[in-house]
Amino acid sequence: EISLGLVGSEMCIRDRNGWFHYAKLYAATAGCIGFMMLKYKWSIGKTEWFKVFPFLIVAINILIAVCSDFESAIKGGINGGWWFSNEGVWLYGGWWNWLNGIAGLINIFCMTGWWGIYSSKKQDDMLWPDMTIWFIVAYDIWNFTYTYNNLPTHTWYCGVALLLAPTFANALWNKGGWIQNRANTLAIWCMFAQVFPLFQVDGIFATLPCLLYTSPSPRDRG
């Protein structure tokens, strides 16, 4: 745990590594490895049945965020809105988390054509042609909404820059390679965030993650 905080007259900022960041780190890394197996045709990456892997790992990544959204909705409902997450951040949960979680589930069912995944001629990319610009835009909007609601301390990094990087690459010079670029940038960010956690709360685009309220002592009340 890394903490700087507001207790009494002192400012308190807490940043903890909760379940979400670890789940995303391992899921994104698994995706990168699986995509390389398909791209370079390593071992089972040569087989036809392994083409279902990108769909499964992307679905798992989406479900991780969906579970986090539902967690915020439930705990926000129980606590009257505000609740203190295991990331050390005050979040405001409500019906919007339910809606965004459902949108994530719809995203999963909108992924098609995974049997058409193939490696480029020079094996530079794993290409998924059915990942159209419309799906990518819908995914980006859903994912940004998730980060805005649940990762407020670093939404600029993981919710804007991290989403736009593979989207621009797909639109301008790397058509069909969006999902592999998304996995690579996400895994790199997750590793960086774990090694340098204070960057998320002390960077130029960071926001104040928490203000802890402590009730006054009997001496103060007297």
Tell me the role of every PLM-derived stretch.
Residues E1-G8, I13, Y213-G222:
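Single conserved hydrophobic/aromatic residue that forms the stacking wall/gate
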Residues S9-E10, R14-T47:
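An N-terminal, globular interaction/scaffold subdomain
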Residues R14-F20, A73-K75, D202:
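Helix-loop junctions on the outward
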Residues F20, G93, P209-L212:
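Non-cytosolic membrane-interface motifs at loop->transmembrane helix junctions
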Residues F20-A23, H154-Y157, Q180-N181:
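Short, aromatic-rich membrane-interface segments at the entry and exit
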